[in-house]
Amino acid sequence: MKIELLNTPADALEIRYEEQIRPLKMDDFTGQQRLTDNLRVFISAAKIRGDALDHVLLSGPPGLGKTTLANIIASEMGGNIKVTSGPMLDKAGNLAGLLTSLRKGDVLFIDEIHRLPAAVEEYLYSAMEDFRIDIMLDSGPSARAVQLRIEPFTLVGATTRSGLLTSPLRARFGISSRFDYYPPELLERIILRASGILGIGVTTEAAGEIAGRSRGTPRIANRLLRRARDFAQVADSFVINHDIAMTTLASLEIDEEGLDDMDKKIMDTIVNKFNGGPVGVASLAVSVGEEQDTIEEVYEPYLIQAGYLARTPRGRVATRLALKRFSSGSGINSSEGPLFDAAPAR
């Protein structure tokens, strides 16, 4: 399987690391059992028919394995994969070039597909449904449309904000799956597997400690493993033991629930500066010095999952659990005010 990255700048060391530990087969993919079981059936059926797999929409918080699964889909279907992202496809011509270069059975992976410009998104409709695109030649009175056939392909779209997808685009995906956060025991398995690939030992106790603070996210678990490896190597150790793991986590200011400095800053701001909320995300972003999109896509999902934050029509509100933990006692009364128990994101 050939992997082609298109207009996706990334750190070379990060790419090499991801390639080292990324599973290449469905059997090696840990977690998301119902999702992968269904995909096995869909892929097998498509191969029996000799068809391209239906287009696949993968949604969920970042770092749960959407890109990895897109690569596995291409591998299982015996095709190549071309990787790009919504913001990079700023012109319809860029998308047309990609589509016409695909061969039968190839996978086009578009990350952050919810950020596709409207004109480019509309260009996808006929490609997804009829495997054709219409290209305009010339301009003005002499302009004419030329229809080009493209090879049957599979579009895999990934999004952290499925609610921003338009209905016409969403309806064209034959397969739609959502990723869930991972339980600690599965993250521990991922850490043990990755440590073997990286050539560093890790004790079960250390792996469990790292897994428990990884916010249910494999990408974070692997990142913490890399940092623990750094501490182990500086200590001239070939094994990450419990002491090294704890030193790593303490140095990175990651607490027993996986909250980092920015998580705590967000909650402290809501609880103590805005009296528990509600507060608009734009005001919150200015207060903590972070981008609004980053708060919504990176920090909020886990804070909601952990039971500290609730989204309401009026803004973000701290839950009772958050008030108990983060209140400084300056005017916050956990028995009064617009407080919420832990609630899922809306």
Curated annotation (Swiss-Prot):
CDD domains: AAA. GO terms for biological process: DNA recombination; DNA repair. It is found in: Cytoplasm. Mg(2+) binds at residue 67. GO terms for cellular component: cytoplasm; Holliday junction resolvase complex. Signal peptide: none annotated. ATP binds at residues 21-22, 63, 66-68, 129-131, 172, 182, 219. It is an enzyme of class 3 (hydrolase). It catalyses: ATP + H2O = ADP + phosphate + H(+). This is Holliday junction branch migration complex subunit RuvB.
